[in-house]
């Protein structure tokens, strides 16, 4: 999974909604498309392709149907990447706050 591709894929609200739909269970493309009545099936197919290319969903064929489910392992990697940024940022903030407190106490 490319973090850049995953973040770009998740920047689109419909793709995030698709990911929510396939998070807990595998769903056929037709069922996913039915959830978005205001969007064409080809647009949903393109969204699914972007999510698949980004490594966020698996596609499985069952006869003529295409079934999709979230790739939770890849999502864990993305979360770890984001957690690292969050943790690093919080650690820096803590260090600055502690330095300011020490400076205040020595005055």
Predicted regions and their residues:
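Amphipathic alpha-helical dimerization/coiled-coil segments
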Residues: 1-2, 20, 24, 75-107
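N-terminal helix-turn-helix DNA-binding core of bacterial DNA-binding proteins
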Residues: 2-40, 65-76
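Alpha-helical interaction segments
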Residues: 57-59, 74-77
